[in-house]
Design a protein with these regions (language model features):
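Conserved beta-strand scaffold positions in the cores of enzyme catalytic domains, especially
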Residues: 115-117, 132-133, 230-232, 269
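Short alpha-helices
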Residues: 118-187
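Active-site cofactor/cluster-binding pocket
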Residues: 73-131
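An acidic intrinsically disordered interaction segment
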Residues: 1-9, 108-115, 136-145
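Short, hinge-like loop/turn segments at secondary-structure boundaries
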Residues: 68-72, 110, 133-136, 284
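Short, motif-level signal for alpha-helix interfacial/capping segments enriched in acidic residues
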Residues: 3-10, 96-98, 148-151
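Glycine-rich, phosphate-binding/catalytic loops in enzymes
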Residues: 39-41, 108-111, 133-134, 186
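Hydrophobic helix-and-loop "lid/oligomerization" segment in the mid-to-C-terminal part
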Residues: 2-28, 33-67, 71, 79-90, ...
Length: 325
């Protein structure tokens, strides 16, 4: 049977040869990064492989229902010495378009291990790696992992199905923004047939918001302003800390409000996550490509959903955004 990805067998061969495998979950982990990583983690464990999941940030509590998520090691790549890297002979880099997205630091290179990149971001710039599988037509990296499993004739159990379904649902905002709707819905249906627990996903990830998270969303909406063609909201670090820096607030406002306002083509939500460090989320309607705006600011992503990090005070950030737009 013809394989979906010509690189499938090559990737599987490298996995079979490896003795100790590292899988990343990117900074500010979302459902796709966690879902695709935990699905691959479970699969490789079933193959008898020694596997470690790493992330530069803590995994949100409401995503820990995914099997394997409670095994993630939170590491600081700045302090990750050669001695800690040495045991690993393969690094699977998922859903990460740049080094800083992998490490959480702007100027840190990845450790000297054989690397395989699997991603769906067209702006991916991780070029100095052994294998690159970039499918920008996929709605989520979890969708690529699903197709790899199909190419490998790997049997997906209900826990792996839940991880993959969660990744796809998360990156498409529960199928609202799938790139290839027909294909994505077919995959989602198959995962449900294989036992994916949709109800647990909804209960844990979408219907279990912390009170401070909701308050932070309200504050962000209150500060929203409009300009020609777009809306934006900028939250300073003092306000962010006031509500305990709730994870996911920026992304939720971006996904559900920034691109949904009548008469405006796109939105920008910026949080000062540390002193003079702003994380930006861009969301747009169908015909507006915000990945190009993000790219000019050193970030990247998809046509209708992208991100970037800007360094400076709030006035400098506003000026940088105005210069680009």
């Amino acid at each position: 049977m013809k394989q979906y990805y010509p690189l499938s067998n090559t990737i599987l061969s490298e996995i079979k040869k490896a003795r100790n495998i590292l899988i990343n979950i990117h900074r500010n982990p979302d459902l796709d990064s966690i879902g695709s990583a935990t699905a691959l983690y479970q699969a490789l464990k079933k193959m008898g492989k020694k596997v470690t999941l790493v992330c530069p940030h803590q995994i949100p509590e409401n995503f820990k229902f995914l099997k394997g998520a409670d095994s993630v090691k939170t590491i600081d790549f700045k302090e990750w010495a050669d001695t800690e890297v040495r045991p690993y002979d393969l690094f699977l880099i998922l859903d990460s378009g740049s080094y800083d997205i992998v490490t959480g630091h702007k100027e840190i290179k990845l450790p000297e291990i054989k690397k395989i990149v699997i991603d769906h971001h067209k702006t991916n710039n991780l070029l100095d790696v052994y294998i690159r599988l970039i499918d920008e037509k996929a709605s989520a990296t979890a969708e690529i992992i699903y197709r790899l499993f199909s190419d490998w004739n790997f049997n997906i159990d209900k826990n792996i199905a839940t991880s993959l379904f969660s990744g796809i649902a998360g990156d498409t905002v529960f199928f609202k923004y799938s790139k290839n709707a027909k294909s994505t819905f077919k995959i989602a249906l198959n995962l449900l047939e294989l036992g994916a627990d949709k109800n647990k996903l909804i209960d844990q990830a979408f219907d279990s918001f912390d009170f401070n998270l909701v308050k932070m969303i309200g504050e962000t909406l209150t500060k929203m302003k409009k300009r020609d063609g777009f809306v934006y909201s900028i939250i300073d670090n003092k306000t962010y800390e006031k509500y305990g820096k709730p994870k996911g607030a920026r992304e939720l406002v971006a996904d559900f409000f920034a691109r949904s306002i009548k008469g405006y083509n796109f939105g920008i939500i910026a949080f000062e996550v540390e002193k003079n460090v702003f994380s930006l989320s861009f969301r747009s309607k169908k015909d507006t490509d915000v990945s190009q705006i993000a790219k000019k600011l050193g970030g990247g992503g998809h046509k209708n959903a992208a991100g970037a990090t800007i360094y400076g005070n709030i006035d400098q950030v506003i000026n940088k955004i105005k210069e680009i737009i």
